[in-house]
Amino acid sequence: MEKITISTEFIKLDSFLKYVSAVASGGEAKIRIAEGEVKVNGEVCTMRGKKIHPGDIVELDGNQFEAVGK
């Protein structure tokens, strides 16, 4: 699992996926989230505006990313 430092209180799920280079664009993030391919803390999440806080774990294509604070 890769730890990803975020410098704000939260980051939206679609922006997080772009930030960690799990997707190539915001459009791809929107589609992948809408199709139920993304998990947040082990549960499928279809809300691209979902707030990701430090401690949350995002999973896509078998890759896991943990958001951590500064």
How should each PLM-predicted stretch be described?
Residues 1, 40-44, 67:
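Secondary-structure boundary/capping motif
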Residues 1-11:
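A detector for short, charged/polar N-terminal pre-domain segments
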Residues 3, 57-70:
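A positively charged, amphipathic N-terminal helix/segment that binds anionic biomolecules
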Residues 9, 13-54:
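A basic, amphipathic helix-loop patch mediating RNA/tRNA/ribosome contacts
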